[in-house]
Amino acid sequence: MIVRKEVKRLHKFFAFKQKDESETELNIYGDIVSMKWFENDVTHFDFAEELSKVTTPNLTVRINSYGGEVSQGLGIYNLLKEWNGHVTTVCDGFACSAASVVFVAGKTRVMPKTSLLMIHNAWTIASGDSEDFKKMAEDLEKINEPIVQS
């Protein structure tokens, strides 16, 4: 007879944790996406829902992420910029692509010497005719504007 034990999940990659009465900490240790495929993925919707529960005046956002979808990263950026408390962002490893946008939302930003911030122009994979590609190039230029402004 095989007995299966339920395994408790010990670590949540995207989790808000109140450290004390004055500070809440959040880890973004996965991809920033519009639809979750893996446990450690972060969506703008989930982030907004969790951020609305924070009652402390300070929030520390710890990031180790290759990034993801720019729309989701910009959404999280805007939530952090509009939040009433003090936001500190810490790059624990990588803050790449959409995660770099989230990183710059912090009023205080911490980059240890062994961490890496990677920012790039928007890119995509496309198919179509020459008109489709012209339109895609225009769209990518428009997408770059808010990234640069952040």
Segment roles from a protein language model:
Residues 1-150:
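Terminal-region recognition feature
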